[in-house]
Amino acid sequence: MKFSFGLLCVMCCFYASAQEKSARPKIGLTFSGGGAKGLAHIGILKAIDSAGLKVDYITGTSMGAIVGALYASGYSGNEIEKMVKLMDWDALLSNNIPLQSLSMEEKEQYKRYAVELPIINKKIRLLQTGYIQGQELNSEISKLFFHVYNIHNFNDLPIPFKCMATDLETGKLVVLDTGNIASALRSSMAIPSVFSAVSRDNKKLVDGGLVRNFPVKNVKQMGADIVIGSNVTNGLSKIDKIKNPVDVLMQMAFFKESEDFKEELPLTDIYIHMPLEKYNTASFGSIDHILAEGNKTGRSYYPQFKRLADSINSLGVSPAKIDKPFYNKSVFVTEVEVTGLHLTSIPFFLHLMNFDDHRYYTAIQISKSVRRAQGSRYYSGITYTLEPLTKDSARIIFNVEENPASFLKAGIYYTKFRGINANINLTSRDFFINNSRDMVSFSLGESMQMEAEHLQYLGRIKNVAFIAGAKMDNQDISSYVDYRIDGAYRQKFYRGYLNFQNSGGNRIAGGIGASIENIRYHPTIHSMTEVQGNFSAIKTYLYLNYNSLNQALYPVRGLKLITELGYVYNQKHNLQLFQNGVQVADPNYDNFTRLSFDGSVFIPIHSGITLFSEIQAGVNFTDKSNVLNNFQIGGINGNFRNQVRFAGLPEASVNSPAVAALQLGLRIPVISNAYIIARVNALLKDFATFNTTTSPGTWLTGYALTFAYKTPIGPLELSAMYSDQGKRLQSYVLFGIPF
């Protein structure tokens, strides 16, 4: 209960008279769990620091455990607050892998499907023990506590510490005070059905808040004479707040903890209850407000902390000095162990990480190595423990959880151009050959697409790959004259390719390749200009790609480049070209060089506003134009053969052998997951004919205004667009992610 300051002074005087001079009353600090609300505890730490009050023992649960452990390991309240404000909580509390961590071979496939279901023992697995595995959270916690890697007994921390977890099998309390501190903290905050359970000491552990959310008994057992307890929860919900089955289950889950709280509360000497009723455990979007409430409460208790500190200090005994964290600390790793591998080998894992023994590593370097391995998508979770061998060296133990070898993925996609389609993908690793990825994808619906690919990793660190694949696209396309629909035809496009690629890190990849294409045309609505039949060609090319985007969907920062320089030859045809129903001479089929470029850049401006720009260019270096090889202009999204996107015109409205386009855009958040996107673009076509020294070309300009919303199964975009040349206001609807 909240004792008066006078009583605390009496207690201090008692210790002054009854103990030797070397004794002083021990101060215990207990922090409750509470998810995002638990960050308000930081305000109490700041007030304690300002008052000069020295804490001797700390206990905590869930988020209270994390805040308490940071303080126990040597961070100040101010330092903890600064770190919390810089954290990307959306990334930490999700299963998303940072796009920058993915290998270049995996980036284009990441987040293309709404659902990814593992296939284990030939069965599709739907659910795990928790939705979020928390790999990024694990990495962040490990980094923050790297400076105390050599401490495996939490009593040896600068301030002795314990945290609470629950045994998932028995429902009993588990007090964690030894071992890997990152694992202990992750266990303490593993909210059932939200975070996956943590394997530790032959147990499956979940959030300690189920049985003891306010562990005052434990800090008393550690030796605390005076206990400061900070609680951010409000206990069981009133009956009028229980409105659905989920509320019922949550209420029942905390019955046991509610009874325990009644025993914990009387053991506090200074009880602090935070006024955070308007927030909940998931209010990480309101961190600044929660921190402000914590600071306000801390300031209100500062006078009490100050008087208590002065009373204790008057006893003439100073507590031991706490060393500050050594932020740039490195450790010399002489031994490496890996546990948990069944589908892949230890050499393969270490090569992916580019990790060697007998080298110095910082926390950031180890985190980068872990992300590099996880970026291959062979692994779903990687944690590590450092065990000191000598004063200057350590053994590192990687605890690895592998992804299942195979996944079934699915999504839906709609545009007026493609119609509505179901996208289905089966991806399997090491199916035929070790160190490989095989993939088969289908888009089934109003249009038909297919892709099959085999990727074979080569080289010690798997930065070289051989890629073989085939694509098919069956699509109805409108033909245009003067920006008006004139007819339609069905295009069947087949492509086989072989690439030899080298990736320099996770941002850049280049290589050489060859492809063979076959295109078949069949008019479905007759038009002024018609093509019927098929032709094929071979292309040999060099390519260079770069991708530093921070996320796949609606990126905020980064650069993406796709460049290709190729030579088209061995064109074979069986075509008939008609003009107003009269057959005309065949198109030109001479060999030619082809250059294409697509670059996008995203720059954060302010308050979530993102400026973006895209440059596209394509040139066929030939003086005899062949419309079948031209670039097809139009469409805001999507991808089909030779497309150059242009806001203002539908897909394939215009074609040209030489195109250069610039788009500028602004994306403005309006509510959570919703944006207004404005685009303006200009395009120059037909600027190079190569049978004259110059060509003025033709300019196109267009605009689009889009409302975009991120749904759980993909983006929904509703656009109005206009072109100065087409002179028509048109709608453009997209739902889902293109195939």
Residue map of PLM features:
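Bacterial Sec-dependent N-terminal signal peptides
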Residues: 1-25, 615, 739
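Patatin-like phospholipase
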Residues: 19-61, 69-371, 375-388, 392-394, ...
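Outer-membrane beta-barrel and related beta-rich outer-membrane complex signature
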Residues: 242, 478-480, 520-526, 573-577, ...
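Gram-negative/organellar outer-membrane beta-barrel architecture
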Residues: 364, 369, 375, 381-553, ...
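C-terminal outer-membrane beta-barrel translocator/porin domains of Gram-negative envelope proteins
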Residues: 407, 540-545, 549-670
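Short glycine-rich beta-strand segments
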Residues: 471-475, 515-519, 564-572, 618-622, ...
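Flexible, solvent-exposed loop segments that connect beta-strands
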Residues: 480-486, 524-530, 577-585, 643-647, ...
